[in-house]
Curated annotation (Swiss-Prot):
Family from the record: Belongs to the histidine acid phosphatase family.
Annotated membrane topology: Single-pass membrane protein; Lipid-anchor; GPI-anchor
This protein's encoding gene: pho-1
Protein's UniProt name: Intestinal acid phosphatase
InterPro entries to which the protein is assigned, alphabetical: Acid_Pase_AS, His_Pase_clade-2, His_PPase_superfam, Histidine_acid_phosphatase
Length: 449
């Protein structure tokens, strides 16, 4: 149980502002990263009886959010409102555009998940909003519904939210990782080869570790919507065989996120584990830490470039299972937070990264909370992060900063993605030698004065 919880109210220039305190810890900023809700498959295999025309909900077609997915995020939105508005009195009772910012990847299912979630937070007919002021007071407009902007960027260049964004460097790192002894030993094992071989025969196309996820994901969703028909039309499908294929895919997903038993996993002079975590989870982890640093730096500052972050209380990312898992992998808590090992976060999973300031020692702390799926609550995962205390929900912010620095992309991610792996290595080596030489020369010159 949380002890010594109090709600402290203060007055600011723009009206009544509230803050939540847990003992001496004052909540000042929240960042939320969630996965979209239930959806149709994004693609499937050649012999699958359930092709794109089998999926009619959500506008129809591949990768669309279902009514169940919309409901999952409506529920999560209500939970977030209950936490941050009702219980913590941290976010405003009525939507405030300066305090909440939402960024989604540029696909329907994440954008509509964000809309559904915000409907749960600020779109209910609960007298928290005013007709004619917050929404049109006309027939046909849902009572209480306040539309909230959801921002996005081009999906191909969204290196924060979309782990499949165009990034040749990331592809090169994965191809190199596949040549490591650990991955080759796994792929060439008799059990893995047997499953991949059987799926190749069943699916009418070559199946390997790169496209296995398409099959396991399609079958997962088809068990929800077409379970009986699936087993009749695909008579090779059994629960036991699916479990084997899914377990193989879980291990592949660990590899794809830079998680190896061999540490460091060096291939041709490159640590493929670190490089993978840098190029996948590094950007979003560093984006979150950048927001935190700005929030702290701008405290007490009234300059125009601080106005946005000073007002902001909640920054939201609406994204994917791959995004959350890459984020957790960057912090090396993927297996602590998500079960089973290698399994991706479920529909409407969410990470809450909360920033606190201690009113006594004046130091910043963070707390990380995880929502596993619809129907589950919020669980503290802070203690799973290496270096964080095992007897507290709060961790020194420098621990998070150190992880971010360690896993920060070597260049701005847009540039790094277009860098050749081998050339960047050579360039980095030459650059380090050049810098070392300059420092040596400087030291010699300094010795003359």
């Amino acid at each position: 149980m949380v002890s010594a919880i109090s709600i402290v109210a203060i007055f600011a220039l723009e009206g009544f502002v509230t803050t939540y305190s847990d003992g001496t810890k004052d909540l000042v900023f929240v960042q939320t990263l969630w996965r979209h809700g239930d959806r149709s498959p994004t693609k499937t295999f050649k012999t699958d009886p359930f092709q794109e025309d089998a999926w009619q909900f959500g506008g129809g077609g591949w990768g669309q959010l279902s009514p169940a997915g919309m409901k999952q995020h409506l529920n999560l939105g209500k939970m977030l409102r209950n936490r941050y508005v009702t219980n913590y009195n941290f976010l405003p009772n009525k939507y405030n555009a300066k305090q909440i910012y939402v960024r989604s990847t540029d696909v329907n299912r994440t954008i509509i998940s964000a809309m559904s979630n915000l409907l749960g937070q600020y779109g209910q007919n609960d007298n928290s909003s005013t007709p004619g002021l917050d929404y049109p007071d006309v027939d046909g407009w849902p009572a209480g519904y306040v539309p909230i902007a959801v921002h996005t960027v081009d999906d191909d260049t969204d290196h924060l939210g979309n782990m499949e964004s165009t990034c040749p460097f990331k592809d090169q790192v994965w191809e190199l990782a596949k040549t490591s002894d650990e991955v080759k030993s796994f792929v060439n094992s008799a059990d893995v080869q047997a499953v991949l071989g059987n799926l190749t025969n069943y699916c009418g196309q070559p199946v390997d570790i790169d496209n296995l996820w398409i099959i396991t994901n399609a079958l997962y969703i088809e068990q929800i919507y077409y379970n009986a028909t699936l087993r009749t039309k695909n008579n090779w499908f059994t629960d036991a065989f699916y479990a084997k294929a899914d377990a193989i895919n879980d291990q592949v997903q660990l590899f794809q996120n830079g998680i190896f038993k061999t540490v460091p996993n060096i291939v041709n002079g490159h640590d493929v584990g670190v490089l993978t975590r840098k190029v996948r989870g590094g950007p979003i982890l560093n984006d979150m830490v950048m927001h935190i640093n700005l929030k702290l730096m701008c405290q007490g500052q009234t300059t125009p470039n601080c106005t946005w972050i000073n007002n902001l209380k909640n920054y939201i990312y609406s994204a994917h299972d791959t995004t959350i898992y890459a984020f957790f992998s960057a912090l090396l808590i993927e297996e602590y937070a998500v079960k089973p090992s290698g399994g991706y976060p479920l529909y409407s999973a969410a990470v809450l990264l909360e920033l606190y300031i201690d009113s006594v020692d004046k130091k910043p702390y963070f707390k990380m909370v995880y929502h596993e799926q619809d129907g589950s609550g919020f669980k503290d995962v802070t203690m799973g992060i290496q270096g964080c205390p095992q007897n507290s929900s709060y961790c020194d912010l420098d621990i998070l900063r150190n992880f971010a620095n360690t896993i920060k992309p070597d260049q701005p991610i847009d540039q790094w993605c277009l860098t050749d792996l081998n050339k960047s290595s050579s360039f980095a080596t030459v650059s380090m030698l050049f810098i070392a030489a300059i420092l040596a020369i400087n030291n010699n010159f300094l010795g003359l004065f």
